[in-house]
Amino acid sequence: AVCIPLGFFKAVKHNSWFDNGTSVLIFMGYAIPGYVLGFLLILFCAVKHEWFPASGFTSIGFEDLSLSGKVTDIFYHSVLPLCAYLVSGFAFLTMLMKNHLMDNLAADYMRTALSKGIAYKDALRRHALRNSLIPIATNLGHQVTLFVAGSFLIEKIFDINGFGLLGFNAIIDRDFPVVMGVLMLSALLML
């Protein structure tokens, strides 16, 4: 929801202070691995400032909470792992949107549309933006697969019992049928 508008404004305002400043932040987010970012988030947000819990997916006494309390508790515990999971995907999709929109802005059909007298904003929205969304839609399935399959390092750091941690523990315990099942399911999700 943020990647498309941010990539759009970065392409429209190319080489401005906004584009250069956000590019630095985006490349930092892309360069930092998710498990390192998770570790830094735990140190800063959980240990130093105690804003969020450091580990687990639920609090002690979760069963005694009401339905709204359970939803709030799960949301509260999932903020840091989600940030660690999604930052690199966010950076990748933002730069993908920017680069494809810039390619489409320089395409012949944009020059043709502008020479026909269509306003620049209309040509941008009707022609360039629509064609730039195709790679985003193509890559979205890959991002969802990575999110569902999980990162066993992030799940290990945050002590979340998920799909990635199941695969990690199966490798450590040499449980080859579970390893094969995890790999097969991950491969099916990638298709």
Positions of the model-derived regions?
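Peri-membrane helix termini and adjoining interfacial loops of integral membrane proteins
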Residues: 48-63, 155-161
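Membrane-water interface segments at the C-terminal ends of transmembrane alpha-helices
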Residues: 25-55, 84-90
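Juxtamembrane transmembrane-helix termini
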Residues: 13, 46-56, 98, 102
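Alpha-helical transmembrane segments of integral membrane proteins
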Residues: 1-18, 34, 64-191
